[in-house]
């Protein structure tokens, strides 16, 4: 709750700037904390008070759920865009008539997908114009103040980040392929290839760069990019496949250019009858082109088996006829080529003497080295996180084995220790619940304890009649306890340190009444039962002694047991805070469900019955 004094300090402090603006209600003032304030609004506000400020224009909290969800959606859109853009390199296709054509159907499909992806970049710019930012001068302490003034947000964004987002959002391929290139002179195929080579790559770089700050924002908000380790490993593998996808597309386009370069070399030899425009499929039916093609030896000279021209690393594309194949066939072949050479660091590439080809091979080797190292490192980190607790348990088990060997424990004790460790691992999977709960706020810790323990505590008939506050106090102090088969929870005559509420498993409870000759009483207890009730009797004593009571029974687990334990100090605290535990009705209920009181009652009934029998015999 924001107090009037806080509002006064907030309006008068140096950290607050005021700007004149009409209220959302249309009058000359705004309501803040149920008070009518002057017609000025906050331009900066603490993050905790952000939701209390109502504005006419929607300003998003950079730490809020809306921005967090949008960042995830935009990250997916960016990855789709990075996948779609290299597909434009597959538009040129080599025809049997020794010419290059453009796949119209693929072109239309890619432009539609690219246009949809561009919409997300435009929305991202809109979101950036309406997202508050933390004032740099307020980062000294706490989470800082949010600047919510629209003009300041716009000014900051225009000077920082807008140009990059604007370049990434431009629909350059659509405009150039559909509008600019058809109106240019010269070969349409040559112009299209130049656009694909330069414009796509130039715009691809800022789009690729946007991935890194976007991932950083998601990590700052949640600590991770993905929620699970397997999703994180798949995310890094997908980035590696994306690099293979880009390299394969570049290799395909360069293969077509190398094949066209071979044709042009032959054309120079046949200069009298050949023109470079002949390699555009729009010129296939031209009479000069037809006569040249009939007499030309271009098909034989530019064959992969010919020694006329060195295709270098692009020889596979010509030999396998990738450049003339259908879209999906050439795409998957190029993807495999990129993945294979990226993983092998380009060791299988046999280059020619062309400088551009050698530089491309160097890029493949360098990029493969960096990306492969990052992939292995990130994959190892993500996958190890799924087995880190298992590895910790193995290390701890090794330490335990070494300690038992050093202390020369007998085999039966060693087996008991191993059995307990294994059962504890199966039950908890290495998670220390108490340690996790201690790091949470008190209110949240109480709610979790209530969720985990309330129904289990209510199974105990003794606690069924208690009110909610008393049950919450008990649940808050319950601690999980595990016992393996043949474990003695308590022995007759030993001090009772804790009261146990059985959740799962069965136990034997028996007594000899202090070792009295011929006396033996036993019973079976299971889920919903409890033991150690002597401790509750001690805690309910108005003047309890410092000496913890001794157990009147021996309790032994006959199967694996899960229980909640309430230690003596906690039980004493609950009994002192809630006087209802001292009620006569609750005491009677305790005695009714207590095995100790049942045994005493049975003994008294037996004594009374024997006395009655003896009196009857004496009277006869």
Curated annotation (Swiss-Prot):
Q: Which residues cross the membrane?
A: 73-93, 102-122, 161-181, 198-218, 237-257, 356-376
A single Pfam family, by name?
A: Ion_trans
Q: Which InterPro entries match?
A: cNMP-bd_dom, cNMP-bd_dom_sf, Ion_trans_dom, K_chnl_volt-dep_EAG/ELK/ERG, RmlC-like_jellyroll
Q: Which GO terms describe its biological process?
A: arbuscular mycorrhizal association; nodulation
Tissue-specific expression: Expressed in roots, stems, leaves, flowers and pods.
UniProt name for this protein: Protein CNGC15b
Q: One MF term in GO for this entry?
A: voltage-gated potassium channel activity
Recorded hits in Gene3D superfamilies, A to Z, give:
1.10.287.70, Helix hairpin bin, Jelly Rolls
What family classification does the UniProt entry report for this protein? Answer: Belongs to the cyclic nucleotide-gated cation channel (TC 1.A.1.5) family.
Topological category with respect to the lipid bilayer: Multi-pass membrane protein
Compartments, record wording: Nucleus membrane
Would I find Metal-binding among this entry's keywords? Answer: no
A cellular component term from Gene Ontology for this protein is: nuclear membrane
User: What's the subunit arrangement here?
Assistant: Interacts (via N-terminus) with DMI1 (via c-terminus). The Nod factor has no effect on this interaction, implying that the complex is maintained after activation.
**Protein species of origin:** Medicago truncatula (Barrel medic)
Any idea which positions bind a nucleoside 3',5'-cyclic phosphate? 462-559
Alphabetical UniProt keywords: Ion channel, Ion transport, Ligand-gated ion channel, Membrane, Nucleus, Transmembrane, Transmembrane helix, Transport
Role played: Cyclic nucleotide-gated channel involved in the establishment of both rhizobial and mycorrhizal associations. Required for full activation of nuclear-localized Ca(2+) oscillations by Nod and Myc factors. Simultaneous activation of the K(+)-permeable channel DMI1 and the Ca(2+) channel CNGC15 can give rise to sustained Ca(2+) oscillations. May function during fertilization in both female and male gametophytic Ca(2+) signaling.
Q: Does the keyword Isomerase apply?
A: no
User: Quick one: where is this thing mainly located?
Assistant: nucleus
